[in-house]
């Protein structure tokens, strides 16, 4: 599995894009390796678990959340991931399959405080809110702390202040920007693979825009030169419409 993944990383690097996230089968193999890690691969395995498994309700996220929950409850062990670290990592998964284990851990005397800290930063809990509320009503101190934190929006107020000033470098795009400029229909096959699909943005030549391969790959080097100036880069078009498909393309590609 590790050899195949490293080969995949090299293939993606040749395209100028990051590797794809692990799928559920790869994540299951990763879990097995984490339980009995090969010598010399420890740091790589932990990095894959922490950074290369998608969050939310992806099937790979289900495998990851189940493994971390088992570690936290002592139902599984890994020499590389402690119970405490497992709870922390559950808290980085945004919502979805990580929520139920964290709510359950509010009743764990050893880990309740850590589970509460994780839930305080998790908003996509949906009906699990009522489970936390019920525990709070029953006197669970950790659950009460979570509700209080949500009520005070600590997930937001704990963030850094918005800077008084933001210095940007302008990426000027002449003419009208339509949906096809950002997300070409001819490249619709790659839309699920956002980094790869983004390579096709502005692939057709226009005044001031210099694609890598006209008709195939957009102005990647031109954008990299702007990034190298050290500022955030702002897309500034003469005309950028506000249709929903354009917003979707902007959200994904830009």
Language model regions located:
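Amphipathic alpha-helical packing elements
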Residues: 2-31, 36
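Active-site-adjacent structural elements in folded domains
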Residues: 71, 83, 218-221
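Structural detector for internal amphipathic alpha-helices that build alpha-solenoid repeat scaffolds
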Residues: 15-20, 42-59, 80-95, 101-104, ...
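Short, charge-rich binding segments
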Residues: 77-83, 87, 92, 224-228, ...
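Short coil turns that connect the paired helices of HEAT/ARM alpha-solenoid repeats
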Residues: 35-40, 73-81, 105-112, 135-139
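Fe-S-dependent hydro-lyases/dehydratases of central metabolism
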Residues: 117-254
């Amino acid at each position: 599995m590790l050899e195949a993944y490293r080969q995949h990383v090299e293939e993606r690097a040749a395209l100028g894009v990051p590797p794809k996230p692990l799928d559920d089968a790869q994540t299951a193999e990763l879990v097995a390796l984490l339980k009995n890690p090969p010598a010399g691969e420890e740091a790589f395995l932990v990095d894959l678990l922490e950074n290369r498994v998608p969050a939310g309700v992806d099937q790979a996220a289900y495998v990851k959340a189940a493994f971390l929950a088992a570690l936290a409850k002592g139902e599984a062990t890994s020499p590389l991931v402690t119970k405490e670290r497992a709870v922390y990592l559950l808290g980085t998964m945004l919502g979805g399959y990580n929520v139920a284990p964290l709510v359950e851990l509010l009743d764990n005397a050893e880990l309740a405080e850590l589970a509460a800290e994780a839930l305080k930063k998790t908003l996509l809990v949906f009906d699990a809110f009522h489970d936390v509320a019920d525990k709070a009503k029953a006197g669970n101190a950790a659950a009460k702390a979570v509700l209080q934190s949500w009520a005070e929006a600590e997930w937001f107020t704990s963030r850094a202040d918005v800077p008084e000033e933001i210095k940007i470098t302008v990426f000027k795009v002449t003419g009208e920007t339509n949906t096809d400029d950002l997300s070409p229909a001819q490249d619709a096959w790659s839309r699920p693979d956002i980094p790869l699909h983004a390579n096709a943005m502005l692939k057709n030549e226009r005044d001031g825009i210099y694609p890598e391969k006209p008709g195939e790959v957009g102005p990647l080097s031109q954008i990299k030169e702007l990034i190298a100036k050290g500022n955030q880069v702002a897309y500034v078009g003469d005309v950028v419409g506000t249709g929903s498909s354009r917003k979707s393309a902007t959200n994904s590609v830009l």
